[in-house]
Amino acid sequence: MRKLYCVLLLSAFEFTYMINFGRGQNYWEHPYQKSDVYHPINEHREHPKEYQYPLHQEHTYQQEDSGEDENTLQHAYPIDHEGAEPAPQEQNLFSSIEIVERSNYMGNPWTEYMAKYDIEEVHGSGIRVDLGEDAEVAGTQYRLPSGKCPVFGKGIIIENSNTTFLTPVATGNQYLKDGGFAFPPTEPLMSPMTLDEMRHFYKDNKYVKNLDELTLCSRHAGNMIPDNDKNSNYKYPAVYDDKDKKCHILYIAAQENNGPRYCNKDESKRNSMFCFRPAKDISFQNYTYLSKNVVDNWEKVCPRKNLQNAKFGLWVDGNCEDIPHVNEFSAIDLFECNKLVFELSASDQPKQYEQHLTDYEKIKEGFKNKNASMIKSAFLPTGAFKADRYKSHGKGYNWGNYNTETQKCEIFNVKPTCLINNSSYIATTALSHPIEVEHNFPCSLYKNEIMKEIERESKRIKLNDNDDEGNKKIIAPRIFISDDKDSLKCPCDPEIVSNSTCNFFVCKCVERRAEVTSNNEVVVKEEYKDEYADIPEHKPTYDKMKIIIASSAAVAVLATILMVYLYKRKGNAEKYDKMDEPQHYGKSNSRNDEMLDPEASFWGEEKRASHTTPVLMEKPYY
């Protein structure tokens, strides 16, 4: 057995060595045979044929002091590694022993920072009207809110009424228009519930007790059972009042109902269906609209505050550029701009409804008799039953740039990929709070990314290059803006960016390989398309090294696991005869092993055979 272990271990190490270094191959004789692909800063394929290297080779450009002007620098020629005539100077800001090349990888240093502003991805549902999922209640399918991010400042306006939407729905002898949208009183009282009351209520539930107030409110609302249907995946939405620290469960999931066919704005007709619409009103600025799917790490992955001194833009080969096509509206302040963005944002509102929704008497009787089956076709939500079920999946005009000087709100529907530092602008989204602002623009982002990429490429060069001349080679990333002009490795003197609170410099003498089209799409320029056609997703080739290292580690881990398994198997075989009593078989070691998976049932995941009844706690229901 020990011999088998040794053989397996040696085989694993041999395989790892072959992956990294090959078998019998001398890489030092061909240091550039499989090196990464880099083109010089200003190479335009204008060289003579003998100087046109294929994409998957690396060229070296020798820097030397030169009196040539910038136009001369536009036509640098490569040298080979056997002492061919050196190329003209590509840049003039560094020492003569420094060889600077420009990467051809068009990466975006903002990718991680801007992830929370990819609303289609992080929210995944409507914003103005959120009806992104379907759920069954008492045998019938209905729609319900499903956005993964909180919507700050969102509320419901009931037309021609002094009743707020957080008023409990009308019951008993109340007129229909005397009620609002909130859950009716229950025993014990489930809505509204203060933050302290919720903390106390869930103090023994380890899955809930430590959640933040918004996520806790969302989970609390999702704990209510609709129509006594314990098998239903339907979860009520909620609104959290940050000022009063209260969680209001919404009995009505509908967010918009307009038109004479479906509602009546006449205040005198107290028992007619009221008209309502979603809005970001000044009276709602402390409210946050929550669906059942609000993620517990929303503070990291969802936008909340607006960005001062910032303007959403598109990353275009080394710099953040303006979004060319926007819809411009007048707005006296940030609140008005945020409100406009919300009104134009993604919406799941149905476009057609059923005729039977005009049967006000049926709805009225449903409220009086607390008969959910009479009103659910209207309020779970309006137009959901046998109507079109349009789902936006978060696509819409969800972003805006507010110009504080011109008082213009620029709204667009393309996902921004970077931020422009501009003291005249505030960047906002439909999810964001209508007035809250953060001032911390990440000024050092560019410099940090440049240094990180240069260091990463330096390590790669040390592994693959055999430079005996002592020259220091630098692979500069395609980032042409920074608050440290020396970090740009620019062949000319960088220019100062105007209206920048970060004192940015931009390098403009390096030709850009991408551009923005009139429909807000970033594309590779025509003359460079052939070069990038062979590079999947434009990923840098140093990722291949990561894959090799990961593969090597995986082989070693698998070998270790196999050895442990064989050892345990041998031990178990020796103990097999001792396990002859039936009570030792199939018996769980702890109560936890006998419980159903709580998260799948309690948090409303896809219904499965063993996940139809919650096991963490008794769900209160009305």
Curated annotation (Swiss-Prot):
SMART domains: AMA-1 (SM00815). Residues 1-24 form the signal peptide. One of its GO terms (biological process) is adhesion of symbiont to host cell. The chain crosses the membrane at residues 547-567. The keyword Glycoprotein applies. GO terms for cellular component: membrane. Belongs to the apicomplexan parasites AMA1 family. This is Apical membrane antigen 1. It comes from Plasmodium falciparum (isolate FC27 / Papua New Guinea).
